[in-house]
A protein has these predicted regions:
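Short, acidic loop-to-helix structural element flanking the phosphoryl-transfer center
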Residues: 1-20, 27-33
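C-terminal cap/substrate-recognition subdomain and adjoining C-terminal extension
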Residues: 26, 30-156
Length: 156
């Protein structure tokens, strides 16, 4: 878990804020069992079947998020990928398109959308290359460097 995650989630629980875990992963038939066990092992609150959704066949979390939002006032989305917030960010080969989408939601970043760094997840690479595992060539390194140094918006 990220440093401070347990303390933050316990703070939420102590203040009557329910936490829903919506994840997409594929680890075979026991994927759900592994995910729930991991949350319990870490001592995270609301580690139960009501609050955990594991998507094995898709990374699209929006349907489940919308279901939760019907019954709850969702105050923040936490994730390591723009796709964790809304599906509209799932654009391949279109860094400029993702930036444009972010610009439309500018007021949500840092308030409703909190992005965690995670260099082990390659989904952000698909926005650049159309593939989460592009070949490690000099040309691809230059493409990645150019995309990584592009600013979504200037700081005012």
């Amino acid at each position: 878990a990220s440093p401070g995650a347990s303390e933050f989630l316990k703070f939420c629980a102590d203040n009557n804020v329910e936490v829903y875990y919506i994840t997409s992963r594929e680890q075979g038939e026991k994927t759900y069992e592994y995910a729930l066990g991991h949350l319990k092992h870490l001592g995270f609150p609301y580690a139960d079947t009501k609050h955990l959704t594991v998507l094995r066949d898709t990374s699209n979390k929006e349907k489940r998020q919308d279901e939760v939002m019907k019954d709850y006032n969702v105050v923040v989305f936490l994730g390591d990928n723009l796709n964790d917030f809304r599906r509209k960010y799932y654009l391949k080969n279109d860094v400029d398109g993702r930036i444009k989408m972010m610009e439309g939601d500018r007021d949500k970043y840092g308030r409703n959308y909190i992005v965690f760094p995670n260099p082990t997840d390659g989904h952000w690479l698909a926005a650049i290359f159309g593939d989460s595992e592009p070949p490690p060539t000099d040309a691809n390194r230059e493409i990645m460097k150019k995309a990584a140094t592009k600013s979504a918006w200037s700081v005012n």
